[in-house]
Amino acid sequence: IMPSLVGSEMCIRDSLWTGKDVYISHDKLRITTLSVNDDMAVIEVYAQLKNIIGHGLEAECLIEIKKDGQKTASDTQRVVFRSEQMQAVRVQIPIEHPKKWSPKQPALYECHITTKFDDKICDEAVSNFGIRVLALDPVHGLQINGETVKLRGTCIHHDNGVIGAETFKEAEWYRCKRLKEAGFNAIRSAHHPMSRAMLDACDHIGILVMDELTDMWDKEKNTYDFSDIFEDEYNQWINHMVEKDYNHPSVIIYSVGNEIQEAGTKQGAWINRMLCNKFHELDNTRYTTNALNGLNCAGRRLGFIMRDVAEKFGMDSHGSGSGGGSNALNSFMSLMSGEKGEFFAKHPLVSEALEECSQSCDITGLNYLSGRYELEHELHPAKTVLGTETYPADIENLWKLVETYPHVIGDFTWTGYDYIGEAGVGIFHYDGNANFTSIYPERLGYIGDIDLIGNRRPISYFREIVYGLTDKPYIAVERLEHAGQTAGKTAWMFKDNISSWTWKGFEGTTANVDVYSSGDEVELFLNDKSLGRKPAGRENHFTASYEVPYEPGTLKAVAYQKDRKLGEYELSTAKSVTKLKVCRVTENERNIAYIKIWLVDDNGTINSQEAEKRLLHASVVGNGVLEGFGTANPSSEEDYFSDSVTTFDGSALAVVRWKDVKSKEPAVLKVWTDDGCQVMINIENN
């Protein structure tokens, strides 16, 4: 049975913290930016200290602020304790010519605190922090240090692909870097508090964070979910979440929930306001939202709304949902796109359902309700709006809304990185089977801009162009194995295409080729012969489409803006696979290393054709073990903990874990195929 999402048990590493006579309470060190300009920043350092000795004493607390190892400011406090008493230290420290933190320049400082008693060090604590201030209004949107920032966001789940739900620093940094390289500047942690390792990665790399409390409150979505203990646990979870997040400059928004079943009820409105108030009580430097879904919020109103939708568009008023839980909702939601989605989003009963929950949040968070963005401003002109979850293929229209309306502060796509669970939502079926029905052996959502092992898919490059981050064009070819066939699709799906011009056996077959470009024109060349110029750019949905009879060789696209060349992109046909190429894609590792493996020909050109797939075998000797081995294949019986895997789209990923992280002995990974290809890589422990 495929669970809705992976990771139902404990999957985040824990630590034991120790301290002596006067210790610094864990997660009770807080650094707050009070003010900042180019000349001066003022921060407040707050720490809770505990005397565990059975008598009173006077201790010393030294606070040092460092940047790149150099001390920039300091302060010393004398602290008097009574027996076994907790005492708080609060001090304001000026920092001259501060380096401000932002996604573009994620400058970090270190706050070092040392407690001493009888001239002996009792405890030490270090926390990274960033100097930055936030502002929010419907005229300027979201501002960081006075500069308006639009959130180019993605939702991500917490699994790390071929190593499952394990949390390693290296795994989180790898995902974070790939997302930043793809043009994202924000992550929504769906639907759980983000790991410390991912928060650290976001701080250093420059990714903004919406951290999310939970996927449900009192009403269950699936049997034995968090709703069973929500009333008993939410207060403690919020406390832990704020303590965990407070010193991370990347965290800017707390989400109190996702698609909450009771959000449109009086009880839901009460819980929502209570949760938002609790977050603000603990942290008044950040903003709150709730990822509201019109279908959930509608509740008993839904029948009346769907009746009106059915009358308007001539469809079944019961939709396509069956059963219950998350999958039924997602199946129903596939109807909520296009014109039907616009009509649904603006329905007066949807407005009524959203009213109370959205009003008690700082930011109105909307899932799949982009049709309400303009209406929300008419109804609540003092509020800002955020697309907390949206369809990937709608990015062109969604980003136009973000750019057009100042009160719309960003967009979070579902999803930027593929994940285990919700099997089938993005898998293309050409045999008449329905999507999102978890047909064995489907296991992945397969709707990530980036696939499970970190490869960017065509929609990722399309999105980067829509964002306005690159002038370089990109070529995507619909898979010729399915030429002339029609696939079933959900609203989350883009196109079944790949950036490849290797289609052995399909010579003469017409290929549907898209060239994505910000330029007003593109020109496509097949083996240096022009296939003509076509319009592209914003006015043509950033896409020029060609029908090209396949022949081996080169396929090159050149982008122009008013006849000025912007950039070019070229594909070459790969010959038969003769080699394996490996590359270490993580850096500064302490626990694990990621090794990407590609099938290539004699010239090093990657061969991603299905007909050329190979069964790979792997072994590790020396100071290492094979922690995970797999591909981005969304439907496979192979597991990630075997030493053999079949390539998918010409690649695979091996994750090696060191047996002894303190040892300098390397691990050696060997990968080979049954037809004689072999490669080895020596993995040094950094």
Language model regions located:
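Extended acidic/polar, glycine-enriched regions
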Residues: 46-137, 549-552, 571
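Short flexible loop/turn segments that cap and initiate beta-strands
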Residues: 56-62, 104-110, 510-512, 518-520, ...
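Edge beta-strands of extracellular beta-sandwich domains
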Residues: 124-129, 564-575, 677-685
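Beta-strand-rich binding/interaction modules
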Residues: 40-79, 89, 511-530, 555-559, ...
